[in-house]
C-alpha cells in the first residue's frame, strides 16, 4: 500500500478534566475522530479540537456514541432504532456546527466504543447507524471494521466504507477486537506496535491472540489518544510507515 490514513480519538476531555494530549496527537495524525459530547467532550473542548485540527489541515470525523458519559461509551445500550438514529444525527449536527465555525467540516463518521463493537454483528443498530449517517449526508464516508454488518448496511445505502485497523489493540482469530475486559487486549510495546502496523498495512496480515495469522483490510490505522504513551506510540508508527515508503494521507 502506497498510502494510508492515521486516525486518533480526540476531544475526550470534559471541563477541567483532560484526557490525552490532543495538540500533540494532531501534529501526528491525518484524521481526528472527535467526540460529540455523548461519551466524552464538552462543547468548549470540542470547539478547541476542531480549531486545532483545522489549523493543521487534519480531517475532522464525528465519533458518535451511545448516550453514556458515565461509562465513556464503553457499555452496550439496547437503544431503539428510532432513538439511535436521532442520537447519531444530533451528534453529527453538533460537531458539524463546531467544525464549520473553525473553518472546516465533518469529513466522515466513526462509531465509538461499545457502539463500534455492537454494529459488527447487531443488525438493528448497524442499520440505524447507517441510516442516520445517510440522512445527514449520503456523501459522508464511515470508518469501521471490514466485513462488519455495519459496513453491509452502509454499502446498501451507497455510503463509502473505509476499513480500519487498530495499532494498539489485540485481535481475535475471527478478526474482531479482543474485549477491553480481557487481559492483554491493549498493547503497549512501542516497537511491537510499529512492527504490526507495517505488517497490517504492507502485507495485509496481523497476528491474533491465539498466535494465528489472519488477513486484515486497512485504509486507516487508529492509534488511541488516551492510551499510556499515546504520543510516543503514534510518533513511532508514523516514523516507521514513512521509513517503509508509505505516504500518510487522509482518506477523506
From Swiss-Prot:
Gene Ontology molecular-function annotations:
5-oxoprolinase (ATP-hydrolyzing) activity; ATP binding
Q: What class of enzyme is it?
A: hydrolase
Similarity comment text for this entry: Belongs to the LamB/PxpA family.
Instruction: Please tell me whether the keyword Ion transport is annotated for this protein.
Output: no
| Assembly, per entry | Forms a complex composed of PxpA, PxpB and PxpC.
Q: What is its EC number?
A: 3.5.2.9
Which HAMAP family does UniProt cross-reference here? Answer: PxpA (MF_00691)
Q: Biological process (GO) annotations?
A: carbohydrate metabolic process
InterPro entries membership: Glyco_hydro/deAcase_b/a-brl, LamB/YcsF/PxpA-like
Q: What catalytic activity is recorded?
A: 5-oxo-L-proline + ATP + 2 H2O = L-glutamate + ADP + phosphate + H(+)
Q: What is this protein called?
A: 5-oxoprolinase subunit A
Keyword annotations: ATP-binding, Hydrolase, Nucleotide-binding
Tell me the function of this protein: Catalyzes the cleavage of 5-oxoproline to form L-glutamate coupled to the hydrolysis of ATP to ADP and inorganic phosphate.
